[in-house]
Amino acid sequence: MMMTQRNYLLHALSALHVGTGQSVGTVDLPIARARASNLPLVPGSALKGVLRDELKLTDNDKKTLFGPESNAMESAHAGAIAVGDANLLILPIRSFAGTVAFATCSYILKHYARDLALKDRIPVPAAETANIGTTSDLKLGNKIALEDLDLTANNNADTQNWASKIAKALYPTDTDWQNEFTRRFVILPDDIFSFLAETATEIRMRI
């Protein structure tokens, strides 16, 4: 049996809240996160469920692709498609210059490069330093300010290369948005990115 694997980029155009099915206390609703890294993700089971509901397929094709419904009387079998988790690549973060920064870190880029078999050199920022491209809008003097953090800015050609590569993958036919993305792209130290991925994500409240 031949298996075909494909990677896709999911672009959230508005706030996305993938819940965990439980609350923190009586108010806050947490988002799904990877257990080891604590980074936000969209579980593959959630993606598969949405695809099953939204794709315009015949019942037979849907059953072949996704398997029978769990409450179906017929014998159960696995579907022909397996959907992996959607892992975080870019996190938008409030910036004092440029309005918003599109942030990632070397840990995430290493996983992205592995999945796509990319050989580009991955910059690793020094402590308290943010790597930005050569045409960045995020600089304030020699600093960038994200949320309440001030970091030393380091213009870096490898960072510019990654900004352009990801921008073309996200906006293959829109050069204006490719430019917008590359001017706001930043690679953060892993620990700072993890901190912002926990504290700078939107909090939904139970009403």
Task: Locate predicted features.
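Basic, Gly/Ser/Thr-rich N-terminal segments that form RNA-phosphate-binding interfaces in CRISPR RAMP
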Residues: 1-207
